[in-house]
Swiss-Prot record:
Principal location: endoplasmic reticulum
Topological category with respect to the lipid bilayer: Single-pass type II membrane protein
Gene transcribed to yield this protein: SBE2
Keyword Oxidoreductase set for record: yes
Protein name from the UniProt record: Sarpagan bridge enzyme 2
Source species: Rauvolfia serpentina (Serpentine wood)
Locations listed in the record: Endoplasmic reticulum membrane
Family statement drawn from the similarity comment of this UniProt entry: Belongs to the cytochrome P450 family.
Summary of the function given for this chain in its UniProt record: Monooxygenase involved in the biosynthesis of ajmaline-type monoterpenoid indole alkaloids (MIAs) natural products, important plant-derived pharmaceuticals used in the therapy of heart disorders. Converts by cyclization the strictosidine-derived geissoschizine to the sarpagan alkaloid polyneuridine aldehyde, precursor of vomilenine, an intermediate chemical in the biosynthesis of ajmaline. Converts by aromatization the tetrahydro-beta-carboline alkaloids tetrahydroalstonine and ajmalicine to the corresponding beta-carboline alkaloids alstonine and serpentine, respectively.
Catalytic activity entry: (19E)-geissoschizine + reduced [NADPH--hemoprotein reductase] + O2 = polyneuridine aldehyde + oxidized [NADPH--hemoprotein reductase] + 2 H2O + H(+); tetrahydroalstonine + A + reduced [NADPH--hemoprotein reductase] + O2 = alstonine + AH2 + oxidized [NADPH--hemoprotein reductase] + 2 H2O + H(+); ajmalicine + A + reduced [NADPH--hemoprotein reductase] + O2 = serpentine + AH2 + oxidized [NADPH--hemoprotein reductase] + 2 H2O + H(+)
Amino acid sequence: MEIMNFSLNSPVFLLLSFFFLLMVLMQLTGSRKYKGKRLPPGPKKLPIIGNLHQMVGSLPHRVLKNLADQYGPVMHLQIGELSAIVISSADKAKEVLNTHGILVADRPQTTVAKIMLYNSLGATFAPYGDYLKQLRQIYALELLSPKTVRSFWTIMEDELSTMVTSVKAEAGQPIVLHDRMLTYLYATLCRATVGSVCNGRETLIMAAKETSALSAAIRIEDLFPSVKILPVVSGLRTRLTNLLKQLDTVLEDIIGEREKKMFSSNNIQPSTEEEDMLGVLLLYKNGKGKDTKFRITNNDIKAIIFELILAGTLSSSAIVEWCMSEMIKNPRVMKKAQDEVRQVLKDKKKVSGSDLAKLEYVKMVIKESVRLHPPAPLLFPREVREDFEMDGMIIPKKSWVIINYWAVGIDPKIWDDAERFEPERFSNSPIDFYGSHFELIPFGAGRRICPGILFGTTNVELLLASFLYHFDWKLPGGMKPEELDMNELFGAGCIRENPLCLIPSISVAGN
Protein backbone atom coordinates (compact mmCIF):
# COMPACT_ATOMS: atom_id res chain seq x y z
CA MET A 1 0.00 0.00 0.00
CA GLU A 2 1.32 3.43 -0.91
CA ILE A 3 1.73 5.59 2.18
CA MET A 4 3.59 8.60 0.75
CA ASN A 5 3.56 9.58 -2.90
CA PHE A 6 6.09 12.41 -2.96
CA SER A 7 9.66 12.17 -4.26
CA LEU A 8 12.80 12.95 -2.30
CA ASN A 9 13.16 16.29 -4.04
CA SER A 10 9.53 17.31 -3.60
CA PRO A 11 8.68 20.53 -1.69
CA VAL A 12 6.89 18.49 0.99
CA PHE A 13 9.93 16.31 1.64
CA LEU A 14 12.26 19.31 1.71
CA LEU A 15 9.95 21.10 4.16
CA LEU A 16 9.77 18.08 6.46
CA SER A 17 13.56 17.63 6.29
CA PHE A 18 14.10 21.28 7.16
CA PHE A 19 11.65 21.01 10.04
CA PHE A 20 13.39 17.89 11.40
CA LEU A 21 16.86 19.46 11.22
CA LEU A 22 15.56 22.60 12.91
CA MET A 23 14.11 20.52 15.73
CA VAL A 24 17.43 18.73 16.25
CA LEU A 25 19.26 22.06 16.38
CA MET A 26 16.80 23.47 18.91
CA GLN A 27 17.10 20.32 21.01
CA LEU A 28 20.88 20.72 21.18
CA THR A 29 20.56 24.43 21.95
CA GLY A 30 17.97 23.75 24.65
CA SER A 31 20.16 21.12 26.28
CA ARG A 32 23.06 23.58 26.54
CA LYS A 33 20.75 26.26 27.95
CA TYR A 34 20.03 24.20 31.09
CA LYS A 35 23.52 22.68 31.42
CA GLY A 36 24.87 23.13 34.94
CA LYS A 37 21.46 24.00 36.41
CA ARG A 38 19.88 21.69 38.95
CA LEU A 39 16.36 21.33 37.59
CA PRO A 40 13.56 19.57 39.48
CA PRO A 41 13.38 15.81 38.91
CA GLY A 42 11.26 14.38 36.12
CA PRO A 43 10.86 11.55 33.64
CA LYS A 44 13.36 10.92 30.85
CA LYS A 45 12.97 13.21 27.83
CA LEU A 46 12.99 12.01 24.23
CA PRO A 47 14.86 13.99 21.57
CA ILE A 48 12.86 16.90 20.09
CA ILE A 49 9.48 16.07 21.66
CA GLY A 50 10.67 15.70 25.25
CA ASN A 51 7.76 14.30 27.31
CA LEU A 52 5.08 15.18 24.77
CA HIS A 53 4.38 11.52 24.04
CA GLN A 54 3.29 11.03 27.65
CA MET A 55 0.65 13.76 27.37
CA VAL A 56 -1.00 12.83 24.07
CA GLY A 57 -4.17 10.73 24.14
CA SER A 58 -4.61 10.81 27.92
CA LEU A 59 -6.16 13.12 30.50
CA PRO A 60 -3.18 15.41 31.27
CA HIS A 61 -4.08 16.10 34.90
CA ARG A 62 -4.23 12.37 35.66
CA VAL A 63 -1.00 11.63 33.78
CA LEU A 64 0.78 14.43 35.64
CA LYS A 65 -0.51 13.24 39.01
CA ASN A 66 0.79 9.73 38.33
CA LEU A 67 4.18 11.15 37.34
CA ALA A 68 4.23 13.38 40.44
CA ASP A 69 3.62 10.31 42.62
CA GLN A 70 6.92 9.03 41.23
CA TYR A 71 9.00 12.22 40.92
CA GLY A 72 7.58 14.49 43.61
CA PRO A 73 5.38 17.60 43.97
CA VAL A 74 7.83 19.81 42.02
CA MET A 75 8.60 18.14 38.70
CA HIS A 76 10.28 19.16 35.44
CA LEU A 77 8.98 18.17 32.00
CA GLN A 78 10.05 19.12 28.51
CA ILE A 79 6.99 19.44 26.25
CA GLY A 80 8.26 20.18 22.78
CA GLU A 81 10.38 23.32 23.15
CA LEU A 82 8.71 24.28 26.42
CA SER A 83 10.24 23.76 29.82
CA ALA A 84 7.41 23.02 32.27
CA ILE A 85 7.49 22.96 36.07
CA VAL A 86 4.53 20.98 37.42
CA ILE A 87 3.37 21.68 40.99
CA SER A 88 1.20 18.99 42.60
CA SER A 89 0.80 19.89 46.28
CA ALA A 90 -0.93 22.67 48.21
CA ASP A 91 2.17 23.76 50.14
CA LYS A 92 4.32 23.99 47.00
CA ALA A 93 1.55 25.86 45.17
CA LYS A 94 1.48 28.35 48.05
CA GLU A 95 5.25 28.74 47.93
CA VAL A 96 5.26 29.39 44.19
CA LEU A 97 2.23 31.71 44.03
CA ASN A 98 2.86 33.61 47.28
CA THR A 99 6.57 33.54 48.12
CA HIS A 100 7.67 33.77 44.48
CA GLY A 101 4.46 35.37 43.19
CA ILE A 102 6.05 38.32 41.41
CA LEU A 103 8.43 35.97 39.56
CA VAL A 104 5.58 33.87 38.13
CA ALA A 105 3.14 36.69 37.42
CA ASP A 106 3.33 36.46 33.62
CA ARG A 107 1.24 34.30 31.30
CA PRO A 108 2.52 32.34 28.30
CA GLN A 109 1.48 34.00 25.05
CA THR A 110 -0.56 31.45 23.09
CA THR A 111 -1.47 31.74 19.43
CA VAL A 112 -5.20 31.88 20.18
CA ALA A 113 -4.81 34.61 22.84
CA LYS A 114 -2.51 36.72 20.69
CA ILE A 115 -4.98 36.79 17.81
CA MET A 116 -8.43 36.63 19.44
CA LEU A 117 -7.57 38.97 22.34
CA TYR A 118 -5.91 41.67 20.24
CA ASN A 119 -2.32 40.75 21.07
CA SER A 120 -3.18 39.35 24.51
CA LEU A 121 -5.00 42.36 25.95
CA GLY A 122 -7.40 41.93 28.87
CA ALA A 123 -6.82 40.56 32.37
CA THR A 124 -6.15 36.90 31.58
CA PHE A 125 -3.15 37.01 29.24
CA ALA A 126 -1.75 40.55 29.48
CA PRO A 127 1.90 40.68 30.62
CA TYR A 128 2.35 41.63 34.27
CA GLY A 129 2.92 45.36 34.72
CA ASP A 130 1.18 48.70 35.20
CA TYR A 131 -1.44 48.02 32.51
CA LEU A 132 -2.52 44.77 34.14
CA LYS A 133 -2.54 46.26 37.66
CA GLN A 134 -4.77 49.15 36.57
CA LEU A 135 -7.04 46.85 34.59
CA ARG A 136 -7.49 44.45 37.50
CA GLN A 137 -8.33 47.43 39.71
CA ILE A 138 -11.13 48.38 37.30
CA TYR A 139 -12.36 44.78 37.40
CA ALA A 140 -12.30 44.71 41.21
CA LEU A 141 -13.82 48.15 41.88
CA GLU A 142 -16.20 48.56 38.96
CA LEU A 143 -16.75 45.82 36.37
CA LEU A 144 -17.01 42.86 38.77
CA SER A 145 -17.32 44.44 42.22
CA PRO A 146 -19.90 43.04 44.69
CA LYS A 147 -22.07 46.11 44.06
CA THR A 148 -21.93 45.61 40.28
CA VAL A 149 -22.68 41.89 40.54
CA ARG A 150 -25.74 42.69 42.69
CA SER A 151 -26.86 45.15 40.01
CA PHE A 152 -26.84 42.24 37.53
CA TRP A 153 -29.20 40.12 39.65
CA THR A 154 -32.18 41.44 37.67
CA ILE A 155 -30.60 40.32 34.39
CA MET A 156 -29.72 36.92 35.84
CA GLU A 157 -33.20 36.38 37.28
CA ASP A 158 -34.84 37.44 34.02
CA GLU A 159 -32.78 35.00 31.94
CA LEU A 160 -33.28 32.25 34.54
CA SER A 161 -37.05 32.63 34.24
CA THR A 162 -36.73 32.13 30.49
CA MET A 163 -34.61 29.01 31.01
CA VAL A 164 -36.93 27.54 33.67
CA THR A 165 -39.94 28.10 31.41
CA SER A 166 -38.20 26.28 28.54
CA VAL A 167 -37.37 23.31 30.80
CA LYS A 168 -40.93 23.17 32.14
CA ALA A 169 -42.20 22.98 28.56
CA GLU A 170 -40.26 19.71 28.17
CA ALA A 171 -41.06 18.18 31.56
CA GLY A 172 -41.10 14.41 31.33
CA GLN A 173 -38.70 14.40 28.36
CA PRO A 174 -34.91 13.90 28.46
CA ILE A 175 -32.99 17.18 28.17
CA VAL A 176 -29.28 17.98 27.94
CA LEU A 177 -28.52 20.33 30.84
CA HIS A 178 -25.34 21.69 29.29
CA ASP A 179 -27.22 23.21 26.35
CA ARG A 180 -29.80 24.96 28.58
CA MET A 181 -27.11 26.39 30.83
CA LEU A 182 -25.02 27.74 27.95
CA THR A 183 -28.07 29.49 26.49
CA TYR A 184 -28.68 31.17 29.86
CA LEU A 185 -25.02 32.08 30.41
CA TYR A 186 -24.43 33.54 26.95
CA ALA A 187 -27.60 35.63 27.22
CA THR A 188 -26.64 36.87 30.69
CA LEU A 189 -23.03 37.65 29.74
CA CYS A 190 -24.03 39.51 26.59
CA ARG A 191 -26.52 41.66 28.49
CA ALA A 192 -24.08 42.34 31.34
CA THR A 193 -21.22 43.30 29.02
CA VAL A 194 -22.82 45.17 26.11
CA GLY A 195 -26.47 45.68 27.09
CA SER A 196 -29.89 44.26 26.31
CA VAL A 197 -30.04 45.82 22.85
CA CYS A 198 -27.17 44.12 21.06
CA ASN A 199 -27.04 43.66 17.32
CA GLY A 200 -24.74 40.79 16.46
CA ARG A 201 -25.24 38.73 19.62
CA GLU A 202 -25.29 35.54 17.53
CA THR A 203 -21.86 36.40 16.10
CA LEU A 204 -20.46 37.05 19.59
CA ILE A 205 -21.71 33.67 20.79
CA MET A 206 -20.47 31.88 17.65
CA ALA A 207 -17.01 33.45 18.05
CA ALA A 208 -16.90 32.47 21.74
CA LYS A 209 -17.81 28.85 20.95
CA GLU A 210 -15.26 28.63 18.12
CA THR A 211 -12.51 30.18 20.22
CA SER A 212 -13.24 27.80 23.11
CA ALA A 213 -13.06 24.86 20.72
CA LEU A 214 -9.71 26.04 19.31
CA SER A 215 -8.38 26.45 22.86
CA ALA A 216 -9.49 22.98 23.87
CA ALA A 217 -6.32 21.08 23.00
CA ILE A 218 -2.57 21.27 23.42
CA ARG A 219 -1.67 23.12 20.26
CA ILE A 220 1.51 22.10 18.46
CA GLU A 221 1.93 25.74 17.40
CA ASP A 222 2.45 26.75 21.04
CA LEU A 223 4.74 23.83 21.86
CA PHE A 224 7.20 24.83 19.13
CA PRO A 225 6.86 28.64 19.17
CA SER A 226 10.14 29.27 17.34
CA VAL A 227 8.80 27.50 14.24
CA LYS A 228 6.83 30.49 13.00
CA ILE A 229 5.50 28.64 9.96
CA LEU A 230 3.50 26.12 12.03
CA PRO A 231 0.37 28.28 12.59
CA VAL A 232 0.37 28.99 8.85
CA VAL A 233 0.86 25.38 7.71
CA SER A 234 -1.73 24.07 10.18
CA GLY A 235 -4.30 26.61 9.05
CA LEU A 236 -4.78 27.89 12.60
CA ARG A 237 -3.73 31.45 11.82
CA THR A 238 -6.10 31.70 8.84
CA ARG A 239 -8.97 30.26 10.84
CA LEU A 240 -8.43 32.62 13.76
CA THR A 241 -7.90 35.66 11.55
CA ASN A 242 -11.18 35.05 9.71
CA LEU A 243 -12.98 34.54 13.01
CA LEU A 244 -11.51 37.75 14.42
CA LYS A 245 -12.71 39.74 11.39
CA GLN A 246 -16.31 38.71 12.09
CA LEU A 247 -15.98 39.38 15.81
CA ASP A 248 -14.25 42.71 15.28
CA THR A 249 -16.93 44.03 12.91
CA VAL A 250 -19.67 43.34 15.46
CA LEU A 251 -17.76 44.77 18.43
CA GLU A 252 -16.74 47.92 16.55
CA ASP A 253 -20.39 48.54 15.63
CA ILE A 254 -21.54 48.00 19.23
CA ILE A 255 -18.85 50.29 20.64
CA GLY A 256 -19.42 52.99 18.03
CA GLU A 257 -23.18 53.05 18.55
CA ARG A 258 -22.88 53.24 22.33
CA GLU A 259 -20.13 55.85 22.29
CA LYS A 260 -22.15 58.08 20.00
CA LYS A 261 -25.18 57.76 22.26
CA MET A 262 -23.22 58.43 25.46
CA PHE A 263 -21.15 61.41 24.41
CA SER A 264 -22.96 63.13 21.55
CA SER A 265 -24.98 65.25 24.02
CA ASN A 266 -22.08 65.85 26.41
CA ASN A 267 -23.26 63.08 28.71
CA ILE A 268 -20.60 62.04 31.22
CA GLN A 269 -22.39 58.99 32.64
CA PRO A 270 -24.24 56.14 30.97
CA SER A 271 -28.01 56.40 31.15
CA THR A 272 -30.00 53.82 33.15
CA GLU A 273 -30.51 51.84 29.97
CA GLU A 274 -26.74 51.62 29.49
CA GLU A 275 -25.62 50.47 32.95
CA ASP A 276 -23.40 47.65 31.78
CA MET A 277 -19.68 46.99 31.52
CA LEU A 278 -19.34 48.64 28.13
CA GLY A 279 -20.59 51.94 29.55
CA VAL A 280 -17.91 51.86 32.26
CA LEU A 281 -15.16 51.01 29.78
CA LEU A 282 -16.15 53.83 27.44
CA LEU A 283 -15.78 56.31 30.30
CA TYR A 284 -12.16 55.20 30.64
CA LYS A 285 -11.61 55.47 26.90
CA ASN A 286 -12.83 59.07 26.97
CA GLY A 287 -10.90 60.11 30.09
CA LYS A 288 -13.98 60.17 32.33
CA GLY A 289 -13.28 57.07 34.44
CA LYS A 290 -12.57 57.19 38.16
CA ASP A 291 -8.86 57.17 37.33
CA THR A 292 -8.73 59.86 34.67
CA LYS A 293 -5.04 59.16 33.93
CA PHE A 294 -5.73 55.59 32.80
CA ARG A 295 -6.99 55.53 29.23
CA ILE A 296 -7.93 52.50 27.18
CA THR A 297 -8.46 51.95 23.46
CA ASN A 298 -11.12 50.23 21.39
CA ASN A 299 -8.89 47.16 21.18
CA ASP A 300 -8.69 47.02 24.99
CA ILE A 301 -12.48 47.23 25.23
CA LYS A 302 -13.02 44.53 22.59
CA ALA A 303 -10.55 42.18 24.28
CA ILE A 304 -12.10 42.72 27.73
CA ILE A 305 -15.67 42.14 26.52
CA PHE A 306 -14.76 39.00 24.60
CA GLU A 307 -12.62 37.71 27.47
CA LEU A 308 -15.52 38.11 29.90
CA ILE A 309 -17.91 36.24 27.61
CA LEU A 310 -15.38 33.45 27.11
CA ALA A 311 -14.46 33.06 30.77
CA GLY A 312 -17.98 33.26 32.16
CA THR A 313 -19.65 30.46 30.23
CA LEU A 314 -17.89 27.09 29.94
CA SER A 315 -16.47 27.05 33.48
CA SER A 316 -19.81 27.92 35.11
CA SER A 317 -21.78 25.38 33.06
CA ALA A 318 -19.18 22.68 33.79
CA ILE A 319 -19.39 23.29 37.55
CA VAL A 320 -23.19 23.01 37.61
CA GLU A 321 -23.15 19.92 35.39
CA TRP A 322 -20.71 18.15 37.71
CA CYS A 323 -22.75 19.23 40.77
CA MET A 324 -25.91 17.75 39.25
CA SER A 325 -24.02 14.59 38.23
CA GLU A 326 -22.73 14.02 41.75
CA MET A 327 -26.15 14.66 43.29
CA ILE A 328 -27.80 12.23 40.87
CA LYS A 329 -25.25 9.60 41.95
CA ASN A 330 -25.84 10.54 45.61
CA PRO A 331 -29.63 10.85 46.13
CA ARG A 332 -29.12 11.67 49.82
CA VAL A 333 -27.21 14.81 48.88
CA MET A 334 -29.79 15.72 46.22
CA LYS A 335 -32.65 15.49 48.72
CA LYS A 336 -30.79 17.47 51.38
CA ALA A 337 -29.96 20.25 48.90
CA GLN A 338 -33.52 20.34 47.54
CA ASP A 339 -34.96 20.47 51.05
CA GLU A 340 -32.73 23.43 51.93
CA VAL A 341 -33.62 25.41 48.80
CA ARG A 342 -37.34 24.74 49.15
CA GLN A 343 -37.32 25.61 52.84
CA VAL A 344 -35.49 28.90 52.23
CA LEU A 345 -37.66 29.92 49.28
CA LYS A 346 -40.92 28.48 50.62
CA ASP A 347 -43.67 29.72 48.28
CA LYS A 348 -41.65 32.17 46.18
CA LYS A 349 -42.11 32.03 42.42
CA LYS A 350 -38.41 32.01 41.62
CA VAL A 351 -34.89 32.04 43.04
CA SER A 352 -33.42 35.51 43.48
CA GLY A 353 -29.92 36.77 44.22
CA SER A 354 -30.92 37.79 47.73
CA ASP A 355 -31.69 34.14 48.59
CA LEU A 356 -28.19 32.84 47.91
CA ALA A 357 -26.58 33.80 51.23
CA LYS A 358 -29.00 31.45 53.04
CA LEU A 359 -28.19 28.38 50.92
CA GLU A 360 -25.35 27.03 53.06
CA TYR A 361 -25.59 23.38 52.01
CA VAL A 362 -25.79 24.27 48.31
CA LYS A 363 -22.51 26.17 48.74
CA MET A 364 -20.98 23.06 50.32
CA VAL A 365 -22.11 20.98 47.33
CA ILE A 366 -20.40 23.43 44.98
CA LYS A 367 -17.16 23.42 47.00
CA GLU A 368 -17.09 19.64 47.06
CA SER A 369 -17.80 19.44 43.35
CA VAL A 370 -15.00 21.84 42.35
CA ARG A 371 -12.65 19.94 44.67
CA LEU A 372 -13.24 16.72 42.72
CA HIS A 373 -14.09 18.23 39.33
CA PRO A 374 -12.34 21.60 39.00
CA PRO A 375 -13.33 23.53 35.87
CA ALA A 376 -9.59 23.85 35.09
CA PRO A 377 -7.75 20.85 36.60
CA LEU A 378 -4.48 22.40 35.42
CA LEU A 379 -4.67 26.06 36.38
CA PHE A 380 -3.84 28.56 33.64
CA PRO A 381 -0.03 28.33 33.32
CA ARG A 382 2.28 31.05 34.60
CA GLU A 383 5.52 32.02 32.89
CA VAL A 384 8.68 32.50 34.94
CA ARG A 385 10.10 36.02 34.60
CA GLU A 386 13.53 35.33 36.12
CA ASP A 387 15.41 32.27 37.39
CA PHE A 388 14.69 31.52 41.04
CA GLU A 389 15.58 28.80 43.51
CA MET A 390 13.13 26.48 45.21
CA ASP A 391 14.22 23.66 47.53
CA GLY A 392 17.74 23.93 46.13
CA MET A 393 16.50 23.54 42.55
CA ILE A 394 16.47 26.15 39.80
CA ILE A 395 13.15 27.17 38.26
CA PRO A 396 14.40 28.60 34.95
CA LYS A 397 13.29 31.79 33.25
CA LYS A 398 10.63 31.36 30.54
CA SER A 399 9.49 28.02 31.99
CA TRP A 400 5.78 27.40 32.31
CA VAL A 401 4.59 26.79 35.86
CA ILE A 402 1.59 24.46 35.84
CA ILE A 403 -0.40 23.91 39.05
CA ASN A 404 -2.11 20.52 38.96
CA TYR A 405 -4.98 21.58 41.20
CA TRP A 406 -6.84 18.32 40.57
CA ALA A 407 -4.00 16.45 42.32
CA VAL A 408 -4.34 18.83 45.29
CA GLY A 409 -8.10 18.26 45.41
CA ILE A 410 -7.72 14.51 45.91
CA ASP A 411 -4.61 14.61 48.11
CA PRO A 412 -5.21 12.14 51.00
CA LYS A 413 -2.78 14.15 53.15
CA ILE A 414 -5.32 17.00 53.09
CA TRP A 415 -8.70 15.31 52.66
CA ASP A 416 -10.14 12.33 54.51
CA ASP A 417 -11.57 9.74 52.12
CA ALA A 418 -10.38 12.11 49.41
CA GLU A 419 -12.18 10.64 46.38
CA ARG A 420 -15.58 10.42 48.05
CA PHE A 421 -18.22 13.09 47.37
CA GLU A 422 -19.05 14.41 50.85
CA PRO A 423 -20.25 18.05 51.00
CA GLU A 424 -20.50 17.87 54.80
CA ARG A 425 -16.69 18.00 55.01
CA PHE A 426 -17.10 21.79 54.56
CA SER A 427 -19.59 22.15 57.42
CA ASN A 428 -18.29 24.73 59.93
CA SER A 429 -15.11 24.98 57.84
CA PRO A 430 -13.43 28.32 57.07
CA ILE A 431 -12.14 26.99 53.72
CA ASP A 432 -13.28 28.96 50.69
CA PHE A 433 -12.07 29.25 47.09
CA TYR A 434 -11.02 32.91 47.08
CA GLY A 435 -7.28 32.21 47.04
CA SER A 436 -6.32 32.08 50.72
CA HIS A 437 -6.77 28.34 51.26
CA PHE A 438 -4.44 26.53 48.87
CA GLU A 439 -6.19 23.21 49.38
CA LEU A 440 -9.12 24.72 47.42
CA ILE A 441 -7.97 27.03 44.59
CA PRO A 442 -10.06 26.06 41.54
CA PHE A 443 -9.97 29.70 40.38
CA GLY A 444 -6.28 30.26 41.05
CA ALA A 445 -4.52 32.39 43.66
CA GLY A 446 -2.05 35.22 43.95
CA ARG A 447 -1.54 38.05 41.47
CA ARG A 448 -3.40 36.30 38.62
CA ILE A 449 -6.38 34.92 40.54
CA CYS A 450 -9.55 34.96 38.44
CA PRO A 451 -11.10 38.44 38.86
CA GLY A 452 -14.58 37.14 38.07
CA ILE A 453 -15.03 34.61 40.89
CA LEU A 454 -18.02 36.40 42.44
CA PHE A 455 -19.83 36.86 39.13
CA GLY A 456 -19.18 33.25 38.14
CA THR A 457 -20.18 31.68 41.45
CA THR A 458 -23.35 33.81 41.58
CA ASN A 459 -24.40 32.34 38.23
CA VAL A 460 -23.50 28.84 39.42
CA GLU A 461 -25.53 29.21 42.63
CA LEU A 462 -28.55 30.67 40.82
CA LEU A 463 -28.54 27.92 38.20
CA LEU A 464 -28.14 25.13 40.71
CA ALA A 465 -30.74 26.54 43.12
CA SER A 466 -33.24 26.95 40.24
CA PHE A 467 -32.77 23.35 39.12
CA LEU A 468 -33.24 22.15 42.71
CA TYR A 469 -36.23 24.37 43.48
CA HIS A 470 -38.38 23.97 40.39
CA PHE A 471 -37.72 20.36 39.39
CA ASP A 472 -37.20 16.80 40.49
CA TRP A 473 -34.75 14.84 38.36
CA LYS A 474 -34.14 11.29 37.20
CA LEU A 475 -31.99 9.48 34.68
CA PRO A 476 -33.56 8.39 31.37
CA GLY A 477 -34.26 4.81 30.33
CA GLY A 478 -34.66 3.52 33.86
CA MET A 479 -30.93 3.98 34.51
CA LYS A 480 -29.92 3.67 38.16
CA PRO A 481 -27.80 6.39 39.85
CA GLU A 482 -24.83 4.07 40.27
CA GLU A 483 -24.84 3.42 36.50
CA LEU A 484 -24.17 7.04 35.57
CA ASP A 485 -20.67 7.35 34.10
CA MET A 486 -18.41 10.14 35.36
CA ASN A 487 -15.87 10.09 32.53
CA GLU A 488 -14.04 13.34 31.81
CA LEU A 489 -13.16 15.15 28.61
CA PHE A 490 -10.17 17.49 28.86
CA GLY A 491 -10.15 20.64 26.76
CA ALA A 492 -10.40 24.34 27.55
CA GLY A 493 -11.69 23.01 30.88
CA CYS A 494 -12.67 19.60 32.17
CA ILE A 495 -16.22 18.65 31.24
CA ARG A 496 -18.21 15.44 31.12
CA GLU A 497 -17.25 13.17 28.22
CA ASN A 498 -20.95 12.43 27.76
CA PRO A 499 -23.20 15.44 28.45
CA LEU A 500 -25.58 14.92 31.36
CA CYS A 501 -29.04 13.99 30.11
CA LEU A 502 -31.84 14.03 32.71
CA ILE A 503 -35.62 13.94 32.82
CA PRO A 504 -37.15 16.87 34.76
CA SER A 505 -40.51 16.73 36.46
CA ILE A 506 -42.13 19.88 37.81
CA SER A 507 -41.87 20.05 41.59
CA VAL A 508 -44.99 20.95 43.54
CA ALA A 509 -42.82 22.63 46.20
CA GLY A 510 -41.11 24.90 43.68
CA ASN A 511 -44.21 25.90 41.74
